[in-house]
From Swiss-Prot:
<protein>
    <recommendedName>
        <fullName>Coronin-7</fullName>
    </recommendedName>
</protein>
<dbReference type="GO" id="GO:0031410">
    <property type="term" value="C:cytoplasmic vesicle"/>
</dbReference>
<feature type="repeat" description="WD 8">
    <location>
        <begin position="728"/>
        <end position="768"/>
    </location>
</feature>
<keyword id="KW-0853">WD repeat</keyword>
<dbReference type="InterPro" id="IPR019775">
    <property type="entry name" value="WD40_repeat_CS"/>
</dbReference>
<dbReference type="Pfam" id="PF16300">
    <property type="entry name" value="WD40_4"/>
</dbReference>
<dbReference type="Pfam" id="PF08953">
    <property type="entry name" value="DUF1899"/>
</dbReference>
<feature type="region of interest" description="Disordered">
    <location>
        <begin position="858"/>
        <end position="925"/>
    </location>
</feature>
<keyword id="KW-0677">Repeat</keyword>
<keyword id="KW-0597">Phosphoprotein</keyword>
<keyword id="KW-0009">Actin-binding</keyword>
<feature type="modified residue" description="Phosphoserine">
    <location>
        <position position="465"/>
    </location>
</feature>
<dbReference type="GO" id="GO:0035332">
    <property type="term" value="P:positive regulation of hippo signaling"/>
</dbReference>
<feature type="compositionally biased region" description="Basic and acidic residues">
    <location>
        <begin position="884"/>
        <end position="896"/>
    </location>
</feature>
<feature type="repeat" description="WD 7">
    <location>
        <begin position="635"/>
        <end position="674"/>
    </location>
</feature>
<dbReference type="GO" id="GO:0005794">
    <property type="term" value="C:Golgi apparatus"/>
</dbReference>
<dbReference type="GO" id="GO:0007030">
    <property type="term" value="P:Golgi organization"/>
</dbReference>
Length: 925
């Protein structure tokens, strides 16, 4: 063979399309795994959305000028780590997740409803599923990797055929050879292994692949002898290696690229030998031709991307535009779009070029799982890509049979988002579905429900049966109020307050914000005096020690409690007219803790009662009038992340770094009354009582650093959470702000740009998602204001303060209503008077209980909408079509002629030429 042969792909060029051809306005998610995050069949594209456990589904080909619509499929209760389409059935999708299961889904055709439940569930595994792939020759076999374990599954029986020998560390890649006989794995222990799963579970061959243990990936060539690996060398440089399984001790060829941190995703077309390398977080694609005969990795072309790459996938060869010499098509997943990038070989003649498009594997499996396991090595019959030889035989897998169509009168439509028509207005974003389905942890049983991605249907009853309940607050919109109400020119803010603190606090009169200057200074801003602050220094409270948390007394708007790193709590009295000078002497200093204080919480009903948690692992209950701690709670084994009083003030709940949630009755004893499992992650957590004190909501992290919500029954903590809802992956703890009147909770973290909004229910489905609020720049915190600050005339459900880098702005959450002239009593029940105490500290400590007064928010000049007179339905005039249907063709013709004659009329007006003046007779000469 000529060593210096000329490649037929040497002139291959990448052709990014125009923006009109993009699948735009999607919301792709970022995941910590090094998988593709997008896959394609000949009909559909599936990709990770920005909601954990939810995939976006979109057609591969558009229909004329109609925009492609994205449907959302709720697959798992946790992050989807990997996905794969069947090589034989375009509508059979497998998904693996951090919830430790593998699920198989039958996706519908255009205009049909997405499934509400998987057809097959494999697992659960002991660890999150990291890798999965369908078998290339047999329908119903797939390989999956979870932790150090690799299993080969018979999906029809929902049982593993074999479990390969344990690896030395986390398995990063597991792929089938093209003939389906071997499995290759790449592991974090730097070893590349080859298995023959039908012969023995141990590796038949192994070698050191890459010198660095960072992410490594594998891809087989068209034959079983050769495969390609990507990874990092000892110098942290990215490299690609070509291997021959017959000479496995060293690589045939290697290629070193650069020192970028993004892992390389190898997209290898085994028929052409073209390899596209996609680096996550980068803006460039590299294309090489893999030539095992030389051996060599020959560069072909490079493509500069317009946006950052989050994932990539190859389109199957049967879907390529072969008449335009498209030899590859890469789907680039970015944050907001899917960009199809075609690789074309320039040719003069517009015809089918057999040298570029050899026969490829068809879509009919060669064997069944039982025969394959018994040793059958039949290969999939090849088909020609020549359009003149099509269509080819099709195949529908029996693993998940297609669903029977519903009757026309109740057939649902897919919950779709028109791509390119998304609302671009700033302020809020609509959820893919009004129902967010949480999961029950695996120790408690199967998932309670699944987000179906189903949307509107002709019948409201069928909609409710398909979607389940939806929140009446789902259309609430967050809006930043006019700039006249902002406080601007804030300088020197302390943005590094401990994670246990909200960062600032507010009541209806003023805001307290810690400053970065030494001495633990706290600025007090008057909400009644908005505008630009002076450039000069503000009068402050000189705390004397760095501030760890602060809280306003709910019954005295002029008293502020400030906790310091010196284990002391200082109570400050702010003058009624505001802070006009620097205060250095607090009203009271509370001492008792031996370590730095974490959190402060005032009692909701009793005056002068304050709870504090500390790094000394205790919670102390203070009598502020006496200036001493009266109760001390124990039992924590690690740092206390958060504490919260129950609405009736009788119980206190805590969440701790030791992974436990505890409930105390402080007046009954120092030990916890109940104890249950909390979030697994140790990065931070928050706890709040919800649903009239029947439930506890905990926000925290799982073991994969994903932010999640856990809902507990307050009387049964030991049984674990009722439901768990995963949100996203971010470093900051979600801070919950709960409105007991509506059952709505606002959730956001320091440094976030999005505020989640959910309605909480004490029974399934527990979480109902509403519109979230988004902003172009991150905020430093969010604090909910009292209910009396809401403008009920504008149906304002909640008002909060948003702290930015240099300003403080109010945000109102309003519900669109048509008849605003009436008081919306269905969303504004009587609210508790939380600014007046019910008990004294001494009475509460002696065992007394009470209930807060209730106050109506209805203005005196408004009547409730429940008593509004019903509007009579407008009478619709019969359409002309109804009259025409009752007339014969002859009558229609006569009426048409009469109408034309009547329009023209019998006009006797003089003609234009009658008004012309002629010439004299003698002028004719």
């Amino acid at each position: 063979m000529n060593r210096f042969r000329v490649s037929k792909f040497r002139h291959t060029e990448a052709r990014p399309p125009r923006r009109e051809s993009w699948i735009s306005d999607i919301r792709a998610g970022t995941a910590p795994s090094c998988r593709n995050h997008i896959k394609s069949s000949c009909s559909l594209i599936a990709f990770n959305s920005d909601r954990p456990g939810v995939l976006g589904i979109v057609p591969l080909q558009g229909q004329g000028e109609d925009k492609r619509r994205v449907a959302h499929l709720g697959c798992h209760s946790d992050l989807v780590t990997d996905l794969d389409f069947s090589p034989f059935d375009d509508f059979l999708l497998a998904t693996g997740s951090a919830d430790r299961t593998v699920k198989l889904w039958r996706l519908p055709g255009p205009g049909q409803a997405l499934p509400s439940a998987p057809g097959v569930v494999l697992g659960p595994e002991d660890l999150p599923v990291e890798v999965l792939q369908f078998h290339p020759t047999s329908d119903g076999i797939l390989v999956s990797a979870a932790g150090t374990t690799v299993k080969v599954w018979d999906a029809a029986k929902q049982q593993p055929l074999t479990e390969l020998a344990a690896h030395g560390d986390l398995v990063q890649s597991a792929v089938w050879s093209r003939d389906g006989a071997l499995v290759g794995t790449a592991c974090k222990d730097k070893q590349l292994r080859i298995f023959d799963p039908r012969t023995k579970p141990r590796a038949s061959q192994s070698t050191q692949a890459h010198e660095n243990s960072r992410d490594s990936r594998l891809a087989w060539m068209g034959t079983w002898e050769h495969l390609v690996s990507t990874g990092f060398n000892q110098m942290r440089e990215r490299e690609v290696k070509l291997w021959d399984t017959r000479f496995f001790s060293s690589a045939l060829a290697s290629l070193t690229l650069d020192t970028s941190l993004g892992c390389l995703v190898p997209l290898l077309d085994p028929d052409s030998g073209l390899l596209v390398l996609a680096g996550k977080g980068e803006r460039q694609l590299y294309c090489y031709e893999v030539v095992p005969q030389q051996p060599a990795l020959s560069p072909v072309t490079q493509c500069v991307l317009e946006s950052v790459l989050r994932g990539a996938a190859l389109v199957p060869r049967q879907a390529l535009a072969v008449m335009s010499c498209e030899v590859l098509r890469v789907l680039q997943l970015s944050d907001t779009a899917i960009v199809p990038i075609g690789y074309h070989v320039p040719r003069k003649a517009v015809e089918f070029h057999e040298d570029l498009f050899p026969d490829t594997a068809g879509c009919v499996p060669a064997t069944d799982p039982h025969s394959w396991w018994a040793g059958d090595n039949q290969q999939v019959q090849k088909v020609s890509l020549n359009p003149a030889c099509r269509p080819h035989p099709s195949f529908t897998s029996c693993l998940v049979p297609p669903a029977e169509p519903l009757p026309d009168t109740a057939q649902p439509a897919v919950m779709e988002t028109p791509v390119g028509d998304a609302d671009a207005s700033e302020g809020f974003s609509s959820p893919p579905s009004s129902l967010t389905s949480p999961s029950t942890p695996s120790s408690l049983g199967p998932s309670l429900s699944s987000t179906s991605g189903i949307g509107t249907s002709p019948s409201l009853r069928s909609l409710q049966s398909l979607l389940g309940p939806s929140s009446k607050f789902r259309h609430a919109q967050g809006t930043v109020l006019h700039r006249d109400s902002h406080i601007t020119n804030l300088k020197g803010l302390n943005l590094t307050t401990p994670g246990e603190s909200d960062g600032f606090c507010a009541n209806k009169l003023r805001v307290a914000v810690p400053l970065l200057s030494s001495g633990g200074q706290v600025a007090v801003l008057e909400l009644r005096k908005p505008g630009r602050l002076p450039d000069t220094a503000l009068p402050t409270l000189q705390n004397g020690a760095a501030v760890t948390d602060l809280a306003w007394d709910p019954f005295d708007p002029h008293r502020l409690a400030v906790a310091g790193e010196d284990a002391r709590i200082r109570l400050w009295r702010v003058p009624a007219e505001g802070l006009e000078e620097v205060l250095t002497t607090p009203e009271t200093v509370l001492t008792g803790h031996t370590e730095k204080i974490c959190s402060l919480r005032f009692h909701p009903l009793a005056a002068n009662v304050l709870a504090s948690s500390s790094y000394d692992l205790t919670v102390r209950i203070w009598d502020l009038q006496a200036g001493a701690d009266r109760l001390k709670l124990q039992g924590h084994q690690d740092q206390i992340f958060s504490l919260a009083w129950s609405p009736d003030g009788q119980q206190l709940a805590t969440v701790c770094k030791d992974g436990r949630v505890r409930v105390y009755r402080p007046r009954s004893g120092p030990e916890p009354l109940q104890e249950g499992p909390g979030p697994k992650g140790g990065r931070g957590a928050r706890i709040v009582w919800v649903c009239d004190g029947r439930c506890l909501l905990v926000s925290g992290f799982d073991s994969q650093s994903e932010r999640q919500l856990l809902l507990y029954e307050a009387e049964a903590l030991a049984g674990g959470p009722l439901a768990v809802l995963g949100l996203d992956v971010a470093p900051s703890t979600l801070l919950p702000s709960y409105d007991p009147d509506t059952g709505l909770v606002l959730l956001t973290g320091k440094g976030d740009t999005r505020v989640f909004l959910y309605e909480l229910l004490p029974e399934s489905p527990f979480f109902l998602e509403c519109n979230s609020f988004t902003s172009p720049d991150p905020h430093k915190g969010l604090v909910l204001l009292p209910k009396t600050e809401c403008d009920v005339r504008e149906v304002e459900l909640m008002r909060c303060l948003r702290l930015r880098q240099s300003s403080l702005e109010p945000v109102a959450f309003r519900l669109p209503r048509v008849r605003k002239e009436f008081f919306q009593d269905d969303v504004f029940p009587d609210t508790a008077v939380i600014w007046e105490p019910v008990l004294s500290a001494e009475a509460w400590l002696q065992g007394a209980n009470g209930q807060p007064w209730l106050l109506s928010l209805q203005p005196p000049d408004m009547s409730p909408v429940s008593q509004a007179p019903r509007e009579a339905p407008a009478r619709r005039a019969p359409s002309s079509a109804q009259y025409l249907e009752e007339k014969s063709d002859q009558q229609k013709k006569e009426e048409l002629l009469n109408a034309m004659v009547a329009k023209l009329g019998n006009r006797e007006d003089p003609l234009p030429q009658d008004s012309f003046e002629g010439v004299d007779e003698d002028e004719w000469d």
